[in-house]
From Swiss-Prot:
Gene3D superfamilies, sorted: XS domain
Function: Forms a complex with IDN2 and FDM2/IDNL2 that is required for RNA-directed DNA methylation (RdDM) and that functions at a downstream step of the RdDM pathway. Required for de novo DNA methylation and 24 nucleotide small interfering RNA (siRNA) accumulation. Binds unmethylated but not methylated DNAs through its coiled-coil domain. May bind double-stranded RNAs (dsRNAs) with 5'-overhangs through its XS domain. However, according to, FMD1 does not bind dsRNAs.
One GO location term (cellular component): plasmodesma
Molecular function terms from GO: DNA binding; double-stranded RNA binding; RNA binding
Coiled-coil ranges per UniProt: 288-469
The protein, known as: Factor of DNA methylation 1
Residue span of region Disordered: 349-375
PANTHER family named in the record: FACTOR OF DNA METHYLATION 1-RELATED, RIBONUCLEASE P SUBUNIT P38
Distribution of this protein across tissues and organs: Highly expressed in flowers and at lower levels in roots, leaves and stems.
Length: 634
């Protein structure tokens, strides 16, 4: 059973069952996955990329097994087996996903008790009792405190006036990470060394001196009354150090998982792009091969036509030589007869008169032959000119065809180069780094080359358009000549000659007459055949009757007669295969020549070979055979 037969027999629901066969072949070693220490896909041998890493090959196999509609069921089953083989047999080749170790924060002497409750994001509190000598406006300026506390690196500072205690309250907000905690604890230690910690603030008595006290905000500050407590409860929340550490670890792991997923998805997208590029490259190679075959067929046909033309010219020259020899022979015969007549001059008067009469006839015949010789010479020269003109026209046509073929080849080559450049650019975009100067330079060069190719393609399309316009003009002239020939030969030539005018879509009466002769008497058969033929001719003209169907897909689709049409099936049952084939032939002709109007169309026809006649055949027939036809009629 061939692979194509297997593909036809595998449905989407049977993919998993069928995958057991290639899986067994993979385990037996029939299909090689590891070749010379490299991992390869045994089912994609035609791709440019052969060597894979384990993760790349696994992503390729799973991607194809769940692939798009362009993948056949056989390909999906094979790649599903490959994915299972990688999981079960080659799992040791899998590269572990690199994950940076989660290192707990090293805070040394600043590390807090894990069970202490802090305000998070980390915040520091500074209070400054206000004396009469103090500048209240300056102390309430947040910018002043931001500069004063700048060495602790707060991200924001807010100053409040606490009316009840006549103090200026300042809250310094730090980053939510461990560097922010270090800044808050450094602030607290700074004030402790100055004897201005929270403990000194709570234990102060009476009117203390005007100085600032500072500490790190904790739960009691969060729950306190006044502007400071309100701000802390609004902007922060209570957290233990262990909660914050656990949350940071979870966030870091989540980011790592997301990055790993993004890398896997990027690799899968890259594999899809690589597959699309390889498929396009293979398609382009097939187009190049087809173009090469077409060009070779064209060259062979051209050589064949040249050989036929050479043989035709040689035949004409041979016929000319033969006629010339025949004319020379007759001239020699006349000269010999004239000499014989001269020997009889001494005969009697009657004989002399007869001899004179014969000489006059001989002279007249000689003049006629000389005239015929001159006409033959002129005809020979005319034939040679016609042959040379025909050869020149044929060479012009061949040159035009070669030029069009060359333009088409160049255009197709440019289009394929453009497609290949686009594929390379897409791969470069996926593989390259935006900061890689070499990649950017290469992509710029490829873009410039792509622009040049597009400009060259536009020039070729413009030139091709001019050539196609000239070709259409030539075709229009040929069609006009055919129409004039059809109009002139209609009624003069018919099916009894090799070349004539046929009405395409008109029924042949002979099959109808033959079948009627078997069913009716001689007198009735002609009438019944004419009636039946006329009825079906009217049926052919009916545009609502469409006994056609489409076969094939894409560019290869064609419209053919539907053998299952009820009217045609009934006709075949009642009147036989010959009548059915006559109607079918007329349908095909009418659909080809006038599908919309559904009426017969005259066409120059080669009745001998059963095909449309060429202009050359018609002109040759008119110049050579029409004289014989006229002589037969007269």
């Amino acid at each position: 059973m061939s692979i194509s037969d297997e593909e036809a027999e595998i449905s989407e629901s049977e993919i998993e069952d069928y995958s057991e066969t290639p899986y067994r072949l993979l385990r037996d070693g029939t299909y090689k996955v590891k070749v010379n220490g490299q991992l390869r896909c045994p089912f994609c041998a035609g791709k440019k990329k052969q060597d894979y890493k384990y993760k790349e090959l696994y992503a390729h196999a799973t991607g194809v097994s769940k692939g798009s509609a362009t993948r056949s069921a056989l390909q999906k089953a094979n790649h599903l087996a490959l994915a299972m083989f990688l999981e079960n047999e080659l799992a040791g080749y899998a590269e572990p996903v690199p994950r940076p170790p989660v290192v707990p924060p090293q805070l040394d002497e600043t590390e807090p008790n894990p069970h202490n409750v802090y305000v998070w994001p980390w915040m520091g509190i500074v209070v400054n009792p206000l004396k009469e000598a103090d500048d209240k406006e300056l102390l309430l300026d947040s910018a002043y405190w931001l500069q004063t506390l700048s060495k602790f690196k707060p991200i924001e500072v807010n100053a409040f006036w606490v009316e009840q205690d006549s103090i200026v309250g300042v809250i310094a907000k730090f980053n939510g990470d461990w560097s922010g905690f270090a800044g808050a604890t450094e602030l607290e230690k700074e004030f402790e060394t100055q004897g201005s910690s929270k403990k000194e603030w709570t234990e102060r008595s009476g009117d203390s001196e005007s100085k600032a006290y500072g500490w790190c905000a904790r739960a009691d500050d969060f729950e306190s009354q006044g502007p400071i407590g309100e701000y802390l409860s609004k902007e922060g929340q209570l957290r233990t150090v262990s909660d914050i550490s656990q949350k940071n670890v979870q966030d870091r792991n989540t980011v790592l998982e997301e990055l790993s997923d993004m890398i896997a998805m990027t690799n899968e997208d890259l594999n899809k792009v690589q597959y699309s590029y390889n498929r396009t490259a293979m398609s382009l190679q097939r187009v190049l091969d087809e173009k090469k075959n077409l060009h070779q067929a064209f060259a062979d046909e051209t050589k064949k036509m040249q050989q036929m033309s050479l043989r035709h010219i040689q035949k004409i020259l041979y016929d000319k030589e033969k006629l010339s020899n025949e004319l020379d022979r007759k001239m020699r015969d006349l000269e010999s007869r004239a000499k014989q007549l001269e020997k009889h001059e001494a005969l009697t008067e009657l004989d002399r008169q007869k001899l004179d009469e014969d000489k006059r006839k001989s002279d007249a015949m000689n003049k006629s032959l000389q005239l015929a010789s001159r006409e033959q010479k002129k005809a020979d020269e005319s034939v040679l000119r016609l042959v040379e003109e025909h050869q020149r026209q044929k060479e012009d046509a061949l040159n035009k065809i070669l030029l069009l073929e060359k333009q088409l080849d160049t255009k197709q080559t440019l289009e394929m180069e453009i497609q290949e450049l686009k594929g390379k650019l897409q791969v470069m975009k996926h593989l390259g780094d935006d900061d890689d100067e070499a990649v950017q330079k290469k992509m710029k060069e490829m873009n410039d080359e792509l622009d040049d190719k597009k400009a060259e393609l536009e020039g070729l399309e413009s030139m091709n358009s001019v050539l196609m316009t000239k070709e259409r003009q030539s075709n229009d002239e040929i069609q006009a000549a055919r129409k004039k020939l059809i109009a002139g030969l209609t009624g003069l030539l018919g099916a009894e000659t090799d070349i004539g005018v046929k009405r395409m879509g008109e029924l042949d009466e002979k099959p109808f007459l033959d079948v009627c002769k078997l069913r009716y008497s001689a007198n009735e058969a002609a009438v019944e055949a004419a009636t039946l033929c006329s009825t079906w001719q009217e049926n052919l003209k009916n545009p609502s009757w469409q006994p056609f169907k489409h076969e094939g897909t894409g560019d290869g689709a064609e419209e053919v007669v539907d053998e299952d049409d009820e009217q045609l099936k009934k006709l075949k049952r009642e009147w036989g295969k010959e009548v059915h084939n006559a109607v079918k032939t007329a349908l095909v002709e009418m659909n080809e020549y006038n599908a919309s109007g559904r009426y017969t169309t005259p066409e120059l026809w080669n009745f001998k070979e059963g095909r449309k006649a060429t202009l050359k055949e018609v002109i040759t027939f008119i110049s050579n055979d029409i004289k014989i036809l006229k002589r037969k009629r007269t």
